[in-house]
């Protein structure tokens, strides 16, 4: 990216400058000269001639705006041209220009002069006088005159309402391009403001209020210029996501301590298990568990251990395609630690731990760590969805689909168990939806890897011409390119795919041995087939990270389909699901503790530092 540079006469000086007015400009060749001249004339009407400067913050224009700005700067020492080769975004351009500004009162307004310039003196003096630290014009206050067409007014009211609701702002209008800040307020807030685009000034105003700065809002006369329509990328993906991001940072995250996170996760787990008692008598389950064969339970644990080196090998292959070569043993330990984190913390917070471990111990960059994890998750979903699909084909060939149709229509009942048809259908729909999305996603990525044109940027560009397109498209492209490195390479796809198949086959075999440990006596072919289906659907059902380790979510899905498709009582099916999950979680915890000791990693520290890393990565992404 080209660095912003200033184009101005060498003779210009900073002496006496009190007010700096920034005009953010992108392809404004038709209007910029008139805007600059009107601005200078208006400032001269209430300020000494040498007390102000006007900065044209030209943001990667591809028309004649740079040449016009250069000429204006050459004609008047009070006019400066601040140039960027690439698009910084409106917020980025403003921030860079304010950094270079000489005045202690920093002002900006839109170059279309939609706000009546007779209000400029009031805007400047509100801050210059020291009465306020920030000031903004408002099109929604009483006594204002704003000819806002419905297509602008409705979205604007909705946006400002959301900002007031979620971010607890006292202002009525955050979007009016007519604002001023004191140098002190700008310097205090600039490092906290993360957005570089259209949300920048909203975030400045919100954070200014939170920090205790005095913010003035006054009515202005405003007349729209040009034709503006709703921009999907800017208004929804951009502005909407930034409201949620700021709300999370200011309101939610300060309340989420490590203790609160653990307690919330445990409560979710207990709640999920408690809800299952509405369908199944716990005493019946405990009775079945008490009859389990200890030797076979131990055998199930040993079998499950085999899947972990396979996970390390798969992760090695993924990282190799991204350009990093590591030993499978170390990577197995990193996976153990991250999966242990997922058992302790909700919302799959343990996933971020792996990126921390490989960065701290092998210096693999955080973006690559997160990308490799995403690749692994996609292949997991693809594999278990494929396994479930294969079993469905087998059921169709043998007439077993009738059993699924029956359970979808009537639910599952027997003994003390009574699961409604609606609940069964919900589980089936969620699992099917996740599976279909995984398969279509991988197919799309594999096909796009062979395409010459930039599909992502072309697709996003259909919805917006705003600078947010660069940010959104860049994030998506980085993620997709890492997936393409594996999915688009036949050899890599085959290696990672076969390893994933082996991992989940071991997972299913573990469940089969657990069922045998509980004395389940059914045809081996049926046992294996139904186990593949129940385990696959159970894991698809726990994709949503609502409880640590998916406890409760996996059990109920496994129970429903095992009881529906095999001659197994619902109580025995639930007991198998609970024991199967317990065995796997026990192996994970033992391996995780051992790996933490061998790699000298604190789990809680890793979770906290990885969360901080994710925040820094978002900041870096916004600054690019």
Curated annotation (Swiss-Prot):
Claim: Membrane is one of the keywords in the record: yes
GO biological process, alphabetically ordered: protein N-linked glycosylation; S-layer organization
Consequence of substituting residue 177 to A: No change in activity
Classification via InterPro entries: DPG_synthase (IPR035518), Glyco_trans_2-like (IPR001173), L-PG_synthase/AglD (IPR022791), Nucleotide-diphossugar_trans (IPR029044)
Knockout consequences: Mutants exhibit defective or limited motility.
Broad enzyme group: transferase
Superkingdom of the source species: Archaea
Keywords from the named record: Cell membrane, Glycosyltransferase, Membrane, Transferase, Transmembrane, Transmembrane helix
Record-annotated membrane-spanning stretches: 260-280, 285-305, 381-401, 427-447, 496-518, 532-552, 556-576, 587-607
Outcome recorded upon mutating residue 201 to E: No change in activity
Enzyme Commission code(s) on record: 2.4.1.-
One MF annotation (Gene Ontology) recorded for this entry: glycosyltransferase activity
One GO CC term on file: plasma membrane
Stated consequence of mutating residue 173 to E: Loss of activity
Effect listed in the UniProt record for changing residue 112 to N: Loss of activity
Biological or metabolic pathway of the protein: Cell surface structure biogenesis; S-layer biogenesis
CDD domains, sorted: DPG_synthase
Impact after mutating residue 175 to A: No change in activity
Subcellular location as annotated: Cell membrane
Family, similarity comment: Belongs to the glycosyltransferase 2 family.
NCBIfam families recorded: flippase-like domain (TIGR00374)
Entry function: Involved in the assembly of a N-linked pentasaccharide that decorates the S-layer glycoprotein and flagellins. Catalyzes the addition of the mannose found at position 5 of the pentasaccharide to its own distinct dolichol phosphate carrier.
Protein name: Glycosyltransferase AglD
Organism from which the protein derives: Haloferax volcanii (strain ATCC 29605 / DSM 3757 / JCM 8879 / NBRC 14742 / NCIMB 2012 / VKM B-1768 / DS2) (Halobacterium volcanii)
Upper lineage: Archaea, Methanobacteriati, Methanobacteriota, Stenosarchaea group, Halobacteria
């Amino acid at each position: 990216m080209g660095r912003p540079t200033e184009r101005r006469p060498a003779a210009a000086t900073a002496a006496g400058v009190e007010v700096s007015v920034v005009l953010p400009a992108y392809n404004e060749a038709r209007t910029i000269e008139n805007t600059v001249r009107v601005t200078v004339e208006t400032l001269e009407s209430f300020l000494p001639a040498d007390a102000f400067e006007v900065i044209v913050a030209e943001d990667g224009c591809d028309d004649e705006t740079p040449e016009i700005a250069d000429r204006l700067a050459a004609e008047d020492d009070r006019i400066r041209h601040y140039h960027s080769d690439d698009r910084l975004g409106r917020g980025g351009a403003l921030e860079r220009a304010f950094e270079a500004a000489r005045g202690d009162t920093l002002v900006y307004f839109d170059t279309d002069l939609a706000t009546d310039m007779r209000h400029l003196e009031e805007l400047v003096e509100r801050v210059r006088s020291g009465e306020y630290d920030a000031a903004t014009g408002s099109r929604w206050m009483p006594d204002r005159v704003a000819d806002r067409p419905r297509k602008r007014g409705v979205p604007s009211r909705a946006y400002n309402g959301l900002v007031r609701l979620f971010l607890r702002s006292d202002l009525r209008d955050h979007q009016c391009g007519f604002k001023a800040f004191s140098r002190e307020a700008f310097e205090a807030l600039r490092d906290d403001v993360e957005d570089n685009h259209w949300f920048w000034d909203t975030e400045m105003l919100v954070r200014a209020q939170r920090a205790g700065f005095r913010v003035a809002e006054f009515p202005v006369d405003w007349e729209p210029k040009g034709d503006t329509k709703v921009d999907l990328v800017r208004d929804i993906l951009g502005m909407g996501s930034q409201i949620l991001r700021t709300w999370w940072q200011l309101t939610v995250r300060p309340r989420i301590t490590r203790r609160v996170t653990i307690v919330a996760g445990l409560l979710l787990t207990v709640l999920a298990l408690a809800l299952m008692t509405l369908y199944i008598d716990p005493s019946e389950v405990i009775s079945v568990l008490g009859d389990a064969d200890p030797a076979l339970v131990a055998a199930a644990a040993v079998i499950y251990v085999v899947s972990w080196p396979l996970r390390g090998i798969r992760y090695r292959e993924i990282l190799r395609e991204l350009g990093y070569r590591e030993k499978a043993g170390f990577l197995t330990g990193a996976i153990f630690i991250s999966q242990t984190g997922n058992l302790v913390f909700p919302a799959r917070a343990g996933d971020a731990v792996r990126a921390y471990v490989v960065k701290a111990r092998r210096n693999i960059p955080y973006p690559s760590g997160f990308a490799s994890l995403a690749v692994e998750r996609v292949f997991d979903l693809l594999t278990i969805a494929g396994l479930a699909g294969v079993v469905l084909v087998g059921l169709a060939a043998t007439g077993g689909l009738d059993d699924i149709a029956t359970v979808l229509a009537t639910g599952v009942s027997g003994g003390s168990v009574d699961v409604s048809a609606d609940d069964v259908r919900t589980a089936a729909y969620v699992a099917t939806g996740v599976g279909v999305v995984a398969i279509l996603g991988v197919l799309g990525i594999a096909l796009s890897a062979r395409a010459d044109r930039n599909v992502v940027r072309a697709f996003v560009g259909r919805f917006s011409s705003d600078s947010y397109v660069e940010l959104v498209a860049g994030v998506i492209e980085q993620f997709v390119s890492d997936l393409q490195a594996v999915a688009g390479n036949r050899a890599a796809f085959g290696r990672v795919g076969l390893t994933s198949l082996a991992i989940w086959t071991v997972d299913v075999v573990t469940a089969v041995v657990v069922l045998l440990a509980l004395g389940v006596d059914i045809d081996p072919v049926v046992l294996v087939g139904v186990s593949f289906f129940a385990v696959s659907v159970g894991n698809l059902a726990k994709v949503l990270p609502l409880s640590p380790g998916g406890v409760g979510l996996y059990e109920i899905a496994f129970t429903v389909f095992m009881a529906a498709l095999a001659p197994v009582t619902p109580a025995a099916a639930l007991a198998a699901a609970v024991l199967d999950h317990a065995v796997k979680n026990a192996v994970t915890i033992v391996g995780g503790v051992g790996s933490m000791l061998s790699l000298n990693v604190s789990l809680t520290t890793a979770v906290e530092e990885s969360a901080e890393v994710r925040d820094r990565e978002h900041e870096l992404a916004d600054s690019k």
